[in-house]
């Protein structure tokens, strides 16, 4: 089970000797001309504060403005343009209208210059180093189990009977309801291995898979069901856990916070939406802003030193040297048949 597999990584110290720095990276996704770039800036600064040894790649759609791309590059991100991926028949009412564009996330399986990547949504903040997750055994898909208790899940049988995998003994799944649902992860954070063959198969499977309310999250859960390994909630705290399953949350141990609840995006926060006036929410919003506003974490001002395989590598100096040499630029991924 997952705890044993997970333990193999948590016991690792430093970087695996056989892995080079360049073979691993974090990756996020950005689309449109809105304000989500602020979340990505906060994310890369959070990774920097946590002294991550790996870069953040931003997979952005063509509609991301040049101005926003430049901001991200100036913060040390690697900006990589991708083409959109759409479901075959857009006839489904998605839980949120903007979910349909998230199928484009599938493009990150094309990033085969990296042997392993950790995907993080742009509304996530990393408060502690999670580089050890790269040392999890290959061949599996690692992510945190989701919570079924919010109204966005009202279309599901789990929600209708009050069942949640975060507390499966509270309301049990009885035989008369049919087969027990498979474990279901939140796709805002996951550990995966890029692969062109996997990417091609993802697209082929997508063509014959009817869209569902949670778009690419449902699709990824279906596709990786047999190789999914849960990791602790500390690696992707969905804010609803604070009021739905507080017994499962220890904020002092949480490493990654996912600001996905309505009204919780720190850069848009007003405190007026339901549950947003909670003291724990206010604290987490402040923690995000403390990182975002910290000028010492800006890329040009960063003195972060990363532990490499044999010694220390200064991330800032390397990236600046690459930039001066003209190596850091937009990378356009090859188009694939849709």
Swiss-Prot record:
InterPro entries (alphabetical): Glyco_trans_8, GNT1/Glycosyltrans_8, Nucleotide-diphossugar_trans
GO molecular function: glycosyltransferase activity; inositol 3-alpha-galactosyltransferase activity; metal ion binding
Binding of Mn(2+), residues: 121, 123, 258
Record-annotated disulphide pairs: none
SUPFAM superfamilies named among the record's database cross-references: Nucleotide-diphospho-sugar transferases (SSF53448)
Organism domain of life: Eukaryota
Keywords, sorted A to Z: Carbohydrate metabolism, Cytoplasm, Galactose metabolism, Glycosyltransferase, Manganese, Metal-binding, Transferase
Active site: 105
Enzyme Commission designation: 2.4.1.123
Biological function: Galactinol synthase involved in the biosynthesis of raffinose family oligosaccharides (RFOs) that function as osmoprotectants. May promote plant stress tolerance.
Family per record: Belongs to the glycosyltransferase 8 family. Galactosyltransferase subfamily.
The protein's name in its UniProt record: Galactinol synthase 2
Organism listed in the record: Solanum lycopersicum (Tomato)
């Amino acid at each position: 089970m997952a705890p044993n597999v997970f333990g193999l990584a948590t016991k690792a110290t430093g970087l695996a000797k056989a892995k080079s720095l360049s073979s691993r990276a974090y990756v996020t996704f950005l689309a449109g001309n809105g304000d989500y770039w602020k979340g990505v800036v906060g994310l890369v600064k959070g990774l920097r504060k946590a002294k991550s040894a790996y870069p953040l790649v931003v997979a952005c759609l063509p509609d991301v403005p040049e101005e926003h791309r430049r901001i991200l590059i100036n913060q040390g991100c690697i900006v990589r343009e991708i083409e959109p991926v759409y479901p075959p028949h857009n006839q489904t009412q998605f839980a949120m209208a903007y979910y349909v564009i998230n199928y484009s996330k599938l493009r990150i399986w094309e990033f085969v210059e990296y042997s392993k990547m950790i995907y993080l949504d742009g509304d996530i903040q990393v408060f502690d180093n999670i580089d050890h997750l790269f040392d999890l055994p290959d061949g599996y898909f690692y992510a945190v189990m989701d919570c079924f208790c919010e109204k966005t899940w009202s279309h599901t049988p789990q929600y209708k009977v009050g069942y949640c995998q975060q507390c499966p003994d509270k309301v049990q799944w009885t035989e008369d309801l049919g087969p027990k649902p498979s474990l279901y992860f939140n796709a805002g954070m996951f550990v995966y291995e890029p692969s062109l063959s996997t990417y091609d198969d993802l697209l082929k499977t997508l063509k014959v898979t009817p869209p569902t309310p949670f778009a690419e999250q449902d699709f990824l859960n279906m596709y990786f069901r047999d190789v999914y390994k849960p990791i602790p909630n500390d690696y992707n705290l969905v804010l609803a856990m604070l009021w739905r399953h507080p017994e499962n949350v220890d904020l002092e141990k949480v490493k990654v916070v996912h600001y996905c609840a309505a009204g919780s995006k720190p850069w848009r926060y007003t405190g007026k939406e339901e549950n947003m006036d909670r003291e724990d929410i206010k604290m987490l919003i402040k923690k995000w802003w403390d990182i975002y506003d910290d000028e010492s974490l800006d890329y040009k001002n960063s003195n972060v030193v990363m532990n490499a395989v044999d010694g220390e590598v200064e991330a800032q100096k390397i990236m600046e040297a690459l930039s001066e040499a003209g190596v850091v630029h937009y990378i356009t991924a090859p188009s694939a048949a849709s």
